[in-house]
């Protein structure tokens, strides 16, 4: 599948780097705040349940999880966070979707536009590239805890599209509509998840040369360093030479 590309693997490695600098804590807390707006009880709120599971997987402290829930429900101040997605282009005509969670959309759109422009990209209108992607659910699990057969039996029975080997982990991919059912089936089977989230999978990928790939990675790094940016999705695939450098 298009989602299981060298670009996807780089995102996983970058995720671990983000965790080292604390970026993932901020992202996880914001996702909990947004999810809790629909209700503070994870039993009846599947998005909140997934957000809490993802936060625990990166060891976000319990008090921070609880405070984030209270912000989302309005029990504490600081819950005025909006989630938005900006679309645009990077070097080489690569399509980008930048998902943000912000308390000031004017500030955030200006910052995202500036970052894109500085790195050879441009902001586009809403809908300009979203049609190039499919929304999927992706559940990540530790490689050494489960066999592919174990996961296939549970996940595919619950409606998953695929179980793939991503090197250090397994990935269970679902259609957006089947995400909660698959995640709940894995939970019921006692499977521990490293992460469970929605992502935008490109329908087709653009193979870029090494220099363009370097420019794109600098752009992605700059976007992800912004405190309001939650996720960056793109439709490029990196050449093996550059992948080796980044690995």
Swiss-Prot record:
The principal localisation class reads cytoplasm
Q: Where in the cell is the protein located?
A: Cytoplasm
Query: Which GO molecular function annotations are given, in alphabetical order?
Result: DNA binding
SUPFAM superfamilies from the xrefs? YebC-like (SSF75625)
Q: Key word Acyltransferase present in the record?
A: no
InterPro entries linked:
Integrase-like_N (IPR017856), TACO1_YebC-like_2nd/3rd_dom (IPR048300), TACO1_YebC_N (IPR049083), Transcrip_reg_TACO1-like (IPR002876), Transcrip_reg_TACO1-like_dom3 (IPR026564), YebC-like (IPR029072)
The protein's UniProt keywords, in alphabetical order, are:
Cytoplasm, DNA-binding, Transcription, Transcription regulation
Q: Which domain of life is it from?
A: Bacteria
Stretches the record annotates as Disordered:
1-22
Q: Name one Pfam family in it.
A: Transcrip_reg
Please give a single GO biological process term from the UniProt record: regulation of DNA-templated transcription
Quote a single Gene Ontology cellular component term: cytosol
UniProt family annotation: Belongs to the TACO1 family.
What is the name of the protein in this document?
A: Probable transcriptional regulatory protein Dvul_0986
Question: What organism is this sequence from?
Answer: Nitratidesulfovibrio vulgaris (strain DP4)
């Amino acid at each position: 599948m298009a989602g299981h590309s060298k670009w996807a693997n780089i995102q996983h490695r970058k995720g671990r780097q983000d965790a080292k600098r604390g970026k993932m804590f901020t992202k996880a807390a914001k996702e909990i705040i947004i999810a809790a707006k629909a209700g503070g009880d994870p039993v009846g709120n599947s998005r909140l349940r997934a957000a809490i599971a993802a936060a625990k997987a990166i060891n976000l402290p319990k008090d921070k999880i609880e405070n984030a829930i209270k912000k989302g429900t309005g029990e504490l101040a600081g819950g005025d966070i909006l989630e938005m997605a900006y679309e645009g282009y990077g070097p080489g005509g690569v399509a980008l979707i930048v998902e943000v969670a912000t308390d000031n959309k004017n500030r955030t759109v200006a910052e995202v536009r500036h970052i894109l422009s500085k790195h050879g990209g441009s902001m586009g209108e809403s809908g300009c590239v979203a049609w190039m992607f499919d929304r999927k659910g992706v559940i990540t699990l530790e490689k050494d805890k489960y066999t592919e057969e174990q996961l296939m039996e549970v996940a595919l029975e619950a409606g998953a599209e695929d179980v793939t080997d991503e090197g250090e982990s397994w990935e269970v991919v679902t259609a957006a509509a089947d995400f909660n059912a698959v995640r709940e089936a894995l939970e019921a089977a006692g499977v521990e998840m490293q992460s469970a989230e929605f992502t935008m999978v490109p329908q087709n990928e653009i193979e870029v040369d090494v220099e363009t790939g370097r420019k794109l990675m600098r752009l992605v790094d700059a976007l992800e360093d912004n405190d309001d940016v939650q996720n960056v999705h793109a439709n490029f695939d990196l050449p093996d030479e550059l992948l080796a450098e980044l690995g």
